[in-house]
Amino acid sequence: AALAREGGLPSALWAGPEKLSGAMRRGDAPIQGQRRKAPVHLRLGFADEELGYAIDFGLPVPGLSVFNLDPEIKRECIWLGPVWRPTTAVVDRQGPLVRARGDRGAWTVVADGLGPQDSIFTQLADPRTAPEILLLRERIRAWRFYDHFRTDELAPARQAQLGTRTPVLSADGADLAAALQTIRELGAGEVLDAAVADAFPGARLEVTAEAGRFGLRLAQEGLLRPLGQAELSDGTLRYLLWIAALLTPRPPGLMVLNEPENSLHPDLLPALARLIAAASERAQIWVVAHSPVLVAALEAQPACNRITLVKELGRTALPGKGWLDGPHWVWPGR
């Protein structure tokens, strides 16, 4: 559904030629396509020291269906360790057939007839035959992606909301007040107050609860009364959302922040970098940023690992990096 909303599988694929010749790269020849030789792939994968996973999407075999642009899962693999090899694979899905390796190393068929749009994570979760599927599924589910917080007048974060204990801020920030109060009541009140003071010196944050609905008030130096969440500037509200996300009492294995500098005053970016650096001690944090100020502030933190991306002939690339410069990775074939 997510791919369909953005134009289907073709919108997620490289729109340039299958291969760029040296003459094309130098500008000596026009960039033009050729007859495609390799199958269409959209491949995603990740690995750590314990487990790795890869999925390979492709187009269906042309037929009478009008859904010929729906992606199909051609291959899924789970393996032990950081690099896939046939000997380290523990779960292997090829088309509709799924095999899992048993305790003695022999392969057992655990599913035959899996739908082309169905992942092993949604259809198979037997802890006896393939515990790695269940383990990896729960690990992925715990990841958090914060892409864009709305701050317009109708934004959920600006409205008082029914609240319960909230150890994880929702993606739309609707439970902001409950999330901040949860942080305070679980023993991190001083850390919360310090994060607010680092960005807004002299400010004091208060969570209100009336008839089960939670709201926010922020008292600031120079003002005769605290401001409610509906009155806060876009930047102030968004910064409070980042505080709630990064001070979570339940840190994930991976948290991705997409352009957290949006709507923030440049003076807030050093404080945001310190907040991110502190959170990275409890979770792996990926930050996608375009602000030189935020990037410089993050680089000043000892744990920062900067990866610069550039655009070359329409492609996203790592400048000065070749195939041998990246981490060792092997894609399972079809």
Model feature map: region roles:
Residues A1-A2, L136-I140, L180, L240-L247, ...:
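Short, Φ-rich (hydrophobic/aromatic) sequence segments
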Residues A1-K19, Y239-A245, V288, V293-A296:
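Phosphate-binding glycine-rich loops of NTP-binding sites
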Residues A1-P62:
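Conserved P-loop NTP-binding catalytic core
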Residues E50-A54, L224-P226, R315:
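Short, mixed charged/polar active-site loops
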Residues A194-L247, L254-P270:
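Conserved ABC ATPase signature
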Residues L227, E231-R238, L246-P249, V256, ...:
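A cross-kingdom feature that marks ATP-driven nucleic-acid transaction machinery
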Residues P270-R334:
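C-terminal lobe/lid and adjacent interdomain/linker elements of RecA-like ASCE P-loop ATPase modules
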